[in-house]
């Protein structure tokens, strides 16, 4: 019988980055996918976190951006991070920016506010040595500078380690030609075959 390994898509991405990518060699890291939704994979002591279930970090509650009036769609948490991210304003604004209008910059400001806030929370709770941002939205590379700037302001030097002092190497884009999920699945399969 052929062994089968199972995990979530975002954990596979976190494992892929930790095995072959930008977090290889680090014992702790976080991979966040920002696309049609929000997913978070956490690596601690070199392994994906599994407690009573996988992390559902897309449902963490964040302080609402002052310009965000969207009530959210989540039936459980009106201001869940995933709903703040999925606001139609943001979706529309990214489209408008690609078409050459200036509305997208405002939407990126809102998006980077929520991302920075979540990253501060994850820094304080998981103490990762690197945070990787992937998914379709993160193909907008200009978001990284905005996220880092807001993150630094929100963290306000509360954590002062060499990792967070070098934000360009702490909050980083995905690697592996955006194939980190497939690469993670390979690692999961290889590990399962060894059991």
Residue ranges of each PLM-predicted region?
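A cytosolic small-molecule/anion-sensing beta-strand core signal
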Residues: 44-45
């Amino acid at each position: 019988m052929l062994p089968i390994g199972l995990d979530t898509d975002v954990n596979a991405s976190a494992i892929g980055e930790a095995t072959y990518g930008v977090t290889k060699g680090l014992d702790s890291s976080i991979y966040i996918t920002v696309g049609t939704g929000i997913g978070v994979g956490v690596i601690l002591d070199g392994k994906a976190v599994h407690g009573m279930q996988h992390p559902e970090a897309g449902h963490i509650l964040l302080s609402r951006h002052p310009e965000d009036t969207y009530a959210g769609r989540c039936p459980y948490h009106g201001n869940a991070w995933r709903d703040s991210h999925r606001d139609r304003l943001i979706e529309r604004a990214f489209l408008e920016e690609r078409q050459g209008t200036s509305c997208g910059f405002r939407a990126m400001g809102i998006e980077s506010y929520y991302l920075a806030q979540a990253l501060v929370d994850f820094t304080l709770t998981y103490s990762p040595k690197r945070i990787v941002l992937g998914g379709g939205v993160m193909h907008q590379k200009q978001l990284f500078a905005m996220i880092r700037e807001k993150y630094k302001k929100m963290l306000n030097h509360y954590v002062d380690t060499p990792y967070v002092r070098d934000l360009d190497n702490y909050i980083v884009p995905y690697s592996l030609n955006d194939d980190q999920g497939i690469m993670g699945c390979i690692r999961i399969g290889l590990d399962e075959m060894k059991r």
